[in-house]
């Protein structure tokens, strides 16, 4: 989901409704499984319900906006629980039961040793993860897609997806708790 070997990275992943296997709910956190790391990264996380099932090429980015932003801040990757690091969202995200776009923008500006994330094969011919990375400038979906800099970011498409977990409140309404 992020490339720690570069100062900046921008990735989008599509998880299908069949993979998530929930009709709807509110996502309160997102977790990724990885090898041990001892660094802190500055991340922006975006979630978006989508009809999109795959990416057509290495720069087929989906437009994301501030309305899709669910987390913005530092994440300590050394705080693993059974190999997973968790990002608690600022507000629960309303998942509609369809495909889900997960977007991670690493704004750290510094690189670490290359750390590997666990993944699974999506399909031999379906690109479900795309990622761009560079040492020269902060990436957004626009400049990752267009490559409009003199130092073009490296962009790749993958036929795999990072292993992910969602903490989810099931149902169409957030619970309301009354305190007297």
Region spans (language model):
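Beta-sheet-rich sandwich/jelly-roll-like modules and their strand-loop junctions
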Residues: 1-54, 107-175
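Aromatic- and Gly/Pro-enriched, solvent-exposed loop/edge beta-strand patches characteristic
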Residues: 22, 42-125
């Amino acid at each position: 989901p992020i490339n720690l070997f570069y100062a900046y990275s921008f990735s989008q992943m599509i998880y299908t409704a069949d993979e998530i296997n929930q009709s709807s709910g509110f996502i309160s956190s997102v977790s990724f499984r990885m090898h041990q790391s001892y660094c802190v990264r500055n991340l922006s996380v975006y979630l978006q319900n989508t009809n999109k099932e795959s990416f057509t090429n290495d720069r087929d980015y989906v437009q994301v906006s501030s309305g899709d932003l669910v987390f913005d801040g530092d994440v300590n990757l050394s705080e693993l629980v059974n190999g997973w690091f968790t990002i608690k969202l600022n507000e629960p995200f309303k998942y509609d039961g369809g495909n889900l776009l997960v977007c991670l923008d690493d704004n750290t500006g510094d690189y670490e040793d290359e750390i590997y994330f666990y993944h699974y094969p999506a399909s031999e011919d379906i690109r479900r993860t795309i990622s761009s990375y560079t040492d020269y400038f902060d990436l957004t979906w626009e400049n990752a897609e267009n490559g409009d800099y003199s130092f073009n970011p490296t962009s790749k498409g993958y036929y795999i997806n990072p292993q992910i977990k969602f903490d989810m409140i099931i149902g169409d309404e957030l619970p309301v708790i009354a305190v007297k």
